[in-house]
Amino acid sequence: MSEKNYEFIDIKRIEPETKSLNVRKVDFSEIYEQTNIKKVSEQASRCLGCGNPYCEWKCPLHNYIPDWLKLIEENRLEEAADLCHETNAFPEICGRICPQEKLCEGACTLNTGYEAVTIGQVEKYISDTALEQGWKPKKYSEKQTKFHVSIIGAGPAGIACAETLIRRGINCTVYDKYSEIGGLLTYGIPVFKLE
């Protein structure tokens, strides 16, 4: 048997570090500290690579979670970012506000006795670091169709819809009654949760 099958025993789940209470009392920015590739790669290495990945099944977007965990374990950040973005218009947001403990992490096989892989932390690291390094999604169609779609509402659903259509070569115009896009992401989620 491969050594990979037992890393989850030796490497314990480590929650993301939070800023001190003294800092958080006067600062309403994001509460989690930045992490690094070593910590994230170590947590990603805990993934068993299940034959039937319940984490992927339980994710509403059916993200390729075991695949991008493997890529991060191998320090292949840009490929992991491409894969994250293939199924998700907002991986940088889902890594922060998605209730992973009820979805992907809640379905992780390791929950039975060993604690789940920190999937949300890894997803946040992948998208944040890739964006900081200038990464841009590569999945847009070079062939434009003759179609044009108008989308009412520039919230998460409207933006995700536009992004999906643009990937398929369909031009979009998004309309919203507010001056800034984002809907709930902009007007409903506090900055300490989504900066």
What are these regions (language model features)?
Residues 89, 155-156, 180:
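Residue-level detector of alpha-helix initiation sites
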Residues 147-173:
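N-terminal Rossmann-like FAD-binding beta1-loop-alpha1 element of flavoenzymes
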Residues 1-148:
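Ferredoxin-type iron-sulfur electron-transfer modules and their immediate structural context
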Residues 50, 152, 175-177:
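Generic beta-strand/beta-sheet core signal
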Residues 53, 155-157, 184-185, 190:
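Gly/Ser/Thr-rich beta-alpha loop segments that engage phosphate groups in nucleotides
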Residues 171-174, 178-195:
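Rossmann-like dinucleotide-binding cores of NAD(P)H-dependent redox enzymes
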Residues 111, 122, 154, 177-178:
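Fold-independent oxyanion-binding glycine-rich loops
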